[in-house]
From Swiss-Prot:
PROSITE patterns: MGS. It comes from Bradyrhizobium diazoefficiens (strain JCM 10833 / BCRC 13528 / IAM 13628 / NBRC 14792 / USDA 110). Keywords: Hydrolase, Multifunctional enzyme, Purine biosynthesis, Transferase. The gene is purH. Pathway: Purine metabolism; IMP biosynthesis via de novo pathway; 5-formamido-1-(5-phospho-D-ribosyl)imidazole-4-carboxamide from 5-amino-1-(5-phospho-D-ribosyl)imidazole-4-carboxamide (10-formyl THF route): step 1/1; Purine metabolism; IMP biosynthesis via de novo pathway; IMP from 5-formamido-1-(5-phospho-D-ribosyl)imidazole-4-carboxamide: step 1/1. GO terms for biological process: 'de novo' IMP biosynthetic process. Residues 2-150 form the MGS-like domain. Belongs to the PurH family. One of its GO terms (cellular component) is cytosol. This is Bifunctional purine biosynthesis protein PurH. The lineage of its organism: Bacteria, Pseudomonadati, Pseudomonadota, Alphaproteobacteria, Hyphomicrobiales. Its EC number is 2.1.2.3, 3.5.4.10. SUPFAM superfamilies: Cytidine deaminase-like (SSF53927), Methylglyoxal synthase-like (SSF52335).
Amino acid sequence: MTDHPRRVTRALLSVSDKTGLIEFAKALAAHDVELVSTGGTAKAIAAAGLKVKDVSELTGFPEMMDGRVKTLHPKVHGGLLAIRDNKDHADAMKAHGIAPIDLLVVNLYPFEATVDKGAGFEDCIENIDIGGPAMIRAAAKNHDDVAVVVEAEDYKAVLDELAANKGATTLKLRRRLAAKAYARTAAYDAAISNWFNRQLEIDAPDFRAFGGKLIQSLRYGENPHQTAAFYATPDKRPGVSTARQLQGKELSYNNINDTDAAYECIGEFDAKRTAACVIVKHANPCGVAEGSDLVSAYRKALACDSTSAFGGIIAMNRALDADTAREITKIFTEVIIAPDASEEAIAIIGARKNLRLLLAGSLPDPRAPGLTAKTVAGGLLVQSRDNAVVDDMTFKVVTKRAPTDAEMRDLKFAFRVAKHVKSNTIIYAKDLATVGIGAGQMSRVDSARIAARKAQDAAVELKLAEPLTKGSVVASDAFFPFADGMLACIEAGATAVVQPGGSMRDDEVIKAADEHGIAMVFTGTRHFRH
């Protein structure tokens, strides 16, 4: 590939986001570039004292239909699409009075922002850009001759090339800008089509598109031999993608994945009702607790599995305070994420330069609709987010003994947590804290036994005479297919169980519970997580 420089003699600018526009236009004018523009962009350039030609002067045709038709004209698209070295194209341009356009600067109508503001259907429709994407695609197709800019962040790259190449752009830059241009129009169309699907309540459209904006190129993926990048999607759900990083090292792929898991889990706990803390390792909670304040919630969560918590991710549902910050800095932690933090807490965390502190502003709404996606070989699995919430469920008592008030409180707590642990999941909980977590086992019995062993290890570390599972309650993310899994929980000391129910052998499981005098409730809601 040669540099193939193309001198910029004429630029068409039409932008909704006018950030940096005037400085850019002035720099183009300094390179003797003729400025052509539309509507508000032309007015802004003219108001800055620059000479600018309205696009209607170029086309000989006025803007019409409330601005819906202004650049959809052969003299615009011919100027963008004409191959400069093609004699037939050159002859056609001369015959029809078409002037070449060497640089196109367009950012699109703010459709995504309009949707985010909760605008009505007609307002959203009016913010669907037609002429902009058409011009962008035309210019990008003809990138051998035309440079196309879709974001203000690329103004500098264009100006640097004009300065270095006597007013010309290189093919290398034009190709990079063309690739970005097509990605932008694809993401824009994805946002529109997904919005339409939501309006029409279409869950499985014939074609599904997803768009994202690069947040960060990552050093590597899950493992050092894998490449990775992090993209923001249009829904702006509070979490790691929207949070401000106040300090610490650059987030890694695994940091982002784990932080997302932690913050989604903490979103289950209403900050107005209780303080809560979640500690995550490898995308699984290893300690979760509620408390009268954050520091007590953190201590209870840490006590569940302090070994796994080393190098973990900590999520809080309230603003991080100084007392909690001091406790956290006593062990190695990768990331802290919270809605906010006090100045004193920020200063305390600041003494640990590598510790990443993220402030998300608010908590994710566990009831909010949305989609999750997972790639498979040659395909994409898409499903609605698991937005079933404990507070909306009916806990049906199916045993002779009903749970006590304290047991029911802990059962609801444990089932909140079970939703966010990899299946098969068994959670032992007591006094609004996890005391044993069994995650990701192929056998539910194994999950029950592993969680009980972890609780026993924690009791030894805390120098307790009895296992933490004694007098605890149990949550299972899915039904017990046989009584053996529940019996393992009873053997560990559990006194009450919450599970979805729905097994062919529910009667057998209920009978075993009654024989051992424990209480059991069904939710009717399963929380598989893979």
